[in-house]
Amino acid sequence: MNVLVLDLETTVDRFDGKIDGSPFNPKNKCVSAHYRWQGKDGVTNLVFNHNEKLISDSIEILRTALARADVLVAHNAKFDCLWLTEMGLTLPPLIRCTMINEYILSKGQRRPLSLKATAERRDVTRKRSDLVDDLFKGGTGFEEMPLGVVLEYAEADVISCAEIYEQQLEELSLTENQSLNSVVEFMNEMLVFLLEIERNGIKVDLDALEVVKLELQNEHALLSRRLRDIVESVMGDSPINLNSGRDMTKVVYSREVSDRQLHIDVWNIGLQPNGKPKYPPRMKKAEFAKAVRDTTKIAYKTDALCCSDCNGTGKIQKYKTLTRQKNGKKYRVAGEAYKNPSKCKTCAGLGAIYHPTGQIAGLRLNPLSPSFASVNGFKTDKGTIALLISQAKGKGNDIAVEFLEKISRLNALSTYLDSFVKGLETWTRKDGILHSSFNQCITATGRLSSSNPNFQNQPKRGFPVRKAVTSRFQGGMFYEFDFSSVEFRVAGAVSRDRQVIDDVLNDKDIHKQTASIIHQIPADQVTKDQRQSCKLHSFAPLFGSMGNGLAAHEKKYYDEFFVIYKDIGKYQQRLMNGVLRNGIVASPSGRQYFWPNVERLRNGRVTNATQIVNYPIQGLAADLVQLSCIRAYKAIKSAGLNSLLVLTVHDSICLDVYPGEEEQVKTIIYDAMTGVGDEAKTRWDYDFPLPLEIEATAGKNWFDQHDIVLT
């Protein structure tokens, strides 16, 4: 086989502190291409856009090389392939990305995957970053650097990549790594699908986005005002910053850290030598309560009195002192004022003196376990707030429920505005198309991540920013096809749990069952709101959660789950025991996850238990979704449709559907997604015993969608 190892150097556009190297930015150009044939010496250099090169090399030379190649090898190959396709070049039949290979061979261990880091780890020819780093920092691009420097730098990249690829092939040939070869093939096929959706991009209606932005900003302002009112009512005049963990501890838990170092020591806060967080201490209920009292003190409401020294400004104007002499005696007088006022020492720059009233401040909620401890007191992150809302409802603490629900919504709105609205505004090109960037090598499980913006981090339903995502075709529609409860089906499949299989085949409403157990009522009496509020618990045990820290009625569900689904519990125990024996967990699709230092705990579980039981399920679910993407891509191309694959988010595939192709698209995508079980047998020799259910919606935009019937 003819294996071509390639590296491209391109210009980048710098704006608003960002660096954009995308081929979709019209300001960017391919400076040069560099390649060599595997097994042969010498690197071919082609220069297209460089200040020292008055006559560009012919792109036809590169076209000929690509046509001759059976395999294209590159590090972060998707970047190079995007540039090649946007330059009008045809890719070889097979792509092999050495970054993807290194990710797979890392077996879930977090390692730096850059070419430089990989070369150093494998002790091959080093990337010559020293040649260009200072130039880059100074704002000099490849097109402006001395051409000799560019060529030396790029040649080292090509040689390094070729040597890495050879080592990876040797490693993949080892007996213990045989299953990884199918993952290499699969992930490099998925790379081609990602090329397709990144090139197609999504159509963004910037006018609609502006309307959504104003709506979100207005809601944010209203919530902020109401939260300030609540804080004032429970904290008195104490100045509170809702973005401060220290202040939020006062508001939510009515406590503040009394001795920071003692707090850190008692709660074992910090990082282990491997960079992972330390484990919280194990404590009985009485020990935990005493530790809370020992490390924190009660926060009290305050009354504020205007500081008389600075008249409430928090600043003191000081003057330079001048020395004068009269009749032989020296004396001092005030000179001109210093340029900047000084902070008032009396009030510490606050402008007021705060006197405790003796009345306990805050919402008086309780941390539920040692895992709630943080360096600034106790946690108030998204997951913790969800648990505290349940506690507040159980206590009938209505003001706490309102505060927590509103602060949770405020945080969500801030994310919507800062990440998504701003992201769409920043990265949508002048033609109205946004080309998001997808990464296969970030999550430990194999799930995709994306950036510019991160579509994988958006809510699954009711997300108003989706109103701005529409069809580019006159009369076109935006379609989304979504796997239903894929992780639950995967868990039932890998554990062969009879009850899961029966529930799936009988179309049982699992979320209604969850609410029935939590609220201790018959399933037919569960309300829509109760079902919705309990959905977050339904599949949490699949991913290693034991319900620790939850209210008693919610914790009951986690205990009951493993009574109902006994074989899932047995499967999880087999995984933990297997890791203790050999340090490896494998998924049916061939992925391997490595935990070298797992130990048995006193409760029968093991260290890293959450990840050990989570990764194989998440990994297989991710692979089934991505396999459906590959199948959809091949089918759409084979049918020669005008409709475009544009996104995959969570467990779904999104398309921009051309008018008149609706029925064809429905049939193709339905077959692609429901057929992954059969293809799993062909690819991975794995019998998937459950049908996969697909839900589909369509609309003029991604938000205003209606259900569509699939056959």
Question: PLM ranges: what are they?
Answer:
Residues R199, T302, C306-K318, Q325, ...:
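Conserved catalytic core of nucleic-acid polymerases
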Residues N28-V31, Y35-A65, A69-L174, L271-Q272, ...:
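Active-site-proximal helix-loop-helix substrate-binding element of RNase H-like nuclease domains
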Residues K78-L89, E102-S106, T249-E256, S484-R498, ...:
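Short active-site loop/helix that positions an aromatic residue
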Residues V5-L6, A74-H75, R96-M99, R472-V486, ...:
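Conserved catalytic palm subdomain of right-hand nucleotidyl-transferase polymerases, strongest
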Residues D671-R683:
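A common structural junction motif
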Residues M1-D16, K27, S32, R126, ...:
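Conserved "right-hand" nucleotidyltransferase catalytic core of DNA-directed polymerases
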Residues S437-A523:
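Function-dense linear segments that define catalytic or interfacial modules
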